Amino acid sequence: MTPQDFYRTLEEDGFSLSSKQKEQFDTYFKSLVEWNTKINLTAITEENEVYLKHFYDSIAPILQGFLANEPIKLLDIGAGAGFPSLPMKILFPNLEVTIIDSLNKRISFLTLLAQELGLENVHFFHGRAEDFGQDKAFRGQFDVVTARAVARMQVLSELTIPFLKIGGKLIALKAQAADQELEEAKNALCLLFGKVIKNHSYQLPNGDSRFITIVEKKKETPNKYPRKAGLPNKKPL
């Protein structure tokens, strides 16, 4: 998917990018490739692949109608090189984006990238989701939490749901169907008061299958969740 294909596909979906937005995606690509020589950000560095498998894939929840261009508070857990939240922010500038990542080098990259892109209302924090999930400044503060290829739903639920307001939504982007994962995550979702409201499949323009699972938070998360760093992965609920 060339940049021109990317712009044209978005236009067909009703999103006509400004010259500034096109420039932001171009700068994003160039910075990603440059920084990738210093720290391991992605195995995908060829321009057409980045536009398809990183940029287009990241904004799919918007294209599929699951996110509006409103000043909602969005948290991205384990965003790595900024996916999916920063491409979303470029497309929908009204989003207020917070990223938590466990690797400080990635946070350094994202901080400089946001400056290069001229993004406002973006915040970056270095640390573990389990620790921030017990911090009152973060817990129960977000309208949406996104996670792209971070963990299985059984683990991901505990890492993300505590951050949501009641009625807030987890948007999980996956490359494989989540049916089996959701079966395994039933107990975790029950304990965390999360309800699956959408399990959506779609295709990238090249025909590759992708999946979006949306979980709504129904009640306050019990205080004991999330457990200490590492435990959700070692002993899933």
UniProtKB/Swiss-Prot annotation:
Gene3D superfamilies linked to this entry: Vaccinia Virus protein VP39
Compartments where found: Cytoplasm
Gene Ontology CC: cytosol
Binding sites annotated in the UniProt record for S-adenosyl-L-methionine: 78, 83, 129-130, 148
Keyword field contains Cell membrane: no
Entry's family note: Belongs to the methyltransferase superfamily. RNA methyltransferase RsmG family.
PANTHER family: S-ADENOSYL-L-METHIONINE-DEPENDENT METHYLTRANSFERASES SUPERFAMILY PROTEIN (PTHR31760:SF0)
Function statement: Specifically methylates the N7 position of a guanine in 16S rRNA.
Official protein name in the record: Ribosomal RNA small subunit methyltransferase G
Organism from which the protein derives: Streptococcus pyogenes serotype M1
